[in-house]
């Protein structure tokens, strides 16, 4: 794949603009919102193709994410989500990431992206046309596991926590849907596209276009929320057979959409990226070095060498772990609220979660079309980086506080791990936990897409290009999965202790988060200091090695 600004024969009849002239053209508009859509005329086809790839992938992931959650909540136990994330998603992700890293040693990111899109197109078609339609024939009977654990037969033996695990295998087709959707999000949306775009675009193009990619993806996230909202309403009208038929068809359509995405990518490579769009006047000095892989052991070695990397890892781990803990508690609350309101769990869950997607999609798109998207350049890196820890702190107070109050009051007879006597005997407030909780969970996702991701990419661009891929593999690739798994392991611990609802430990979880928040904020302040030093000296960011050396081994 040719880089946009590479030296290729130029058509003398159509003089090319220089990179500076393209930048000036892209930034020439002064009327909002055109002033925020900073794309030059010669870049529109390229931007449109990349935006379609990212937007379509984001739509597929956001819709299938709602579907996978509603499947698990309706056919399994809420705690099963934690087991799936830790015991299935994490190890499979590590294996797949290792395979990807091995492939990248001998193949380009473009080729690996091709393989990934083809594989997921096949998997989604398989889900929609085979696994779900024939689920009753290829998996154990519906009541196989439920009969084993009926009437608390296993409770007195201390094996009640195994119910969730039995259901995961009993309903293995829905478990497969969950794992497949999670992998699609982490591989295609969060890693492959961004890596492909970084190769296709110059740094200055990336700075302008990346916020716009997130605008498009969040507009489609808004469309996804409307789709899931419409679906949840229709489920109440359709009979079981029609519901299954339409639900299965969604995944078949997604498989076809991924195939179209692959074709658009090939079009961009074969017709747009092979042509020179402008004459580069600013390049990135690339040091020569061996192409490195970053497996788990290599990642740990890297982290042990650099204080900077430790801070980046903490920043990622705390965000993903906090999001997982808060969202798990919130989704458990949704499941309990559905019972309290005598509503079908899948429809109730889809209606609530689609509301969350609606808020996130609209607000992120608006925020990224305002000067907020350039806060790093205008007001400093910390103005964006500090938002996620503050939003997560507020969300933890609301979600864990309401979960603590509601858990001990519905259903009757339940008591939380500690302090249940303080709130026992009151009427549960599911409106606060579920409906107001939407805004807390939405706030954390807005903080990620509009603040965390932008600030992370900004500081990543200051890392020496020789080390950047290795370091990003740690805090971008590995830590997202580890952070989610930490939250899931926490929920699993309480399940083993006899609490299948993580909300039972809400006061303990809140106390832990009040300790973690200051540490997270301190790590952001440290990273801001390193970023500012790099900008002021116009040099790669100081990795601040524990050994005092200047270079990684």
Swiss-Prot record:
Where does the record place it? Cell membrane
In the bilayer, the protein is annotated as: Multi-pass membrane protein
- Cross-referenced InterPro entries: ADP_ATP_car_bac_type
The entry lists its GO molecular-function terms as: ATP binding; ATP:ADP antiporter activity
Q: Per its UniProt record, what Pfam families does this chain match?
A: TLC
- Keywords recorded for this protein, A-Z: ATP-binding, Cell membrane, Glycoprotein, Membrane, Nucleotide-binding, Transmembrane, Transmembrane helix, Transport
- Could you name the domain of life of the organism this protein comes from? Eukaryota
Sugar-modified residues: 27, 406, 532
Transmembrane segments in this chain: where? 44-64, 79-99, 115-135, 154-174, 176-196, 210-230, 244-264, 308-328, 362-382, 385-405, 477-499, 507-527
Cellular component, GO annotation:
plasma membrane
Say what the protein does. ATP transporter involved in the uptake of ATP from the host cell cytoplasm. Provides the microsporidian cell with host ATP in exchange for ADP. This is an obligate exchange system. This energy acquiring activity is an important component of microsporidian parasitism.
Concerning its family, UniProt says:
Belongs to the ADP/ATP translocase tlc family.
Write the protein's name: ADP,ATP carrier protein 2
Query: From which lineage does this chain's organism come?
Result: Eukaryota, Fungi, Fungi incertae sedis, Microsporidia, Unikaryonidae
């Amino acid at each position: 794949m040719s880089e946009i600004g590479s030296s290729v024969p130029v058509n003398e009849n159509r003089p090319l603009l220089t990179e500076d002239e393209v930048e000036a053209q892209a930034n020439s508009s002064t009327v909002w919102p055109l002033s925020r859509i900073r794309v030059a005329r010669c870049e529109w086809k390229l931007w449109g193709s990349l935006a379609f790839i990212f937007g379509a992938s984001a739509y597929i992931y956001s819709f299938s994410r709602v579907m996978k959650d509603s499947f698990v909540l309706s056919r399994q136990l809420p705690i099963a989500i934690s087991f799936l994330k830790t015991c299935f998603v994490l190890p499979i992700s590590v294996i797949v990431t290792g395979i990807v890293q091995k492939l990248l040693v001998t193949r380009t990111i473009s080729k690996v992206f091709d393989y990934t899109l083809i594989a997921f197109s096949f998997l989604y078609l398989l889900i929609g046309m085979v696994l779900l339609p024939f689920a009753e024939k290829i998996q154990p009977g519906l009541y196989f596991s439920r009969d084993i654990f009926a009437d608390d037969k296993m409770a007195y033996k201390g094996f009640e926590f195994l119910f969730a695990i039995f259901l995961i295998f009993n309903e293995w087709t829905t478990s497969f849907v969950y794992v497949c959707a999670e992998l699609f999000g982490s591989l295609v949306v969060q890693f492959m596209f961004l890596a492909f775009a970084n190769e296709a675009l110059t740094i200055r193009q990336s700075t302008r276009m990346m916020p716009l990619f997130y605008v498009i993806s969040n507009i489609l996230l808004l469309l996804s929320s409307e789709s899931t909202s419409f679906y949840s309403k229709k489920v109440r009208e359709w009979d079981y057979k029609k519901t299954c038929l339409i639900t299965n068809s969604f995944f078949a359509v997604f498989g076809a959409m991924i195939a179209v995405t692959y074709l658009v990518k090939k079009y961009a490579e074969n017709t747009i990226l092979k042509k020179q769009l402008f004459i580069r006047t600013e390049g990135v000095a690339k040091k020569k070095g061996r192409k490195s892989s970053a497996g788990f052991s290599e990642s740990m070695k890297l982290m042990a060498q650099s204080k900077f990397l430790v801070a980046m890892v903490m920043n990622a781990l705390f965000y993903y772990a906090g999001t997982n803990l808060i969202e798990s508690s919130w989704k458990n609350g949704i499941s309990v609220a559905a019972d309290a309101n005598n509503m079908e769990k899948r429809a109730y869950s889809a209606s609530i979660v689609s509301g969350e997607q609606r808020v996130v999609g609209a607000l992120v798109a608006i925020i990224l079309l305002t000067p907020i998207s350039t806060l790093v350049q205008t007001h400093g890196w910390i103005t964006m980086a500090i938002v996620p820890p503050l939003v997560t702190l507020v969300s933890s107070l609301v979600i864990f506080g309401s979960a603590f109050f509601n858990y001990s009051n519905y259903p009757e007879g339940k008591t939380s791990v500690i302090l249940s006597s303080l709130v026992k005997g009151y009427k549960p407030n599911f409106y606060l936990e579920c409906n107001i909780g939407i805004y807390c969970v939405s706030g954390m996702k807005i903080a990620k897409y509009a603040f965390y991701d932008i600030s992370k990419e900004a500081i990543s661009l200051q890392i020496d290009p020789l080390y950047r891929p290795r370091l990003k593999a740690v805090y971008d690739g590995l830590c997202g999965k580890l952070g989610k798994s930490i939250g899931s392991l926490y929920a699993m611990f309480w399940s083993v202790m006899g609490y299948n609802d993580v909300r039972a430990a809400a006061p303990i979880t809140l106390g832990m988060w009040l300790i973690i928040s200051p540490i997270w904020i301190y790590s952001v302040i440290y990273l801001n200091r390193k970023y500012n030093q790099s900008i002021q000296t116009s040099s790669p960011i100081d990795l601040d090695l524990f050994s005092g050396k200047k270079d990684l081994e």
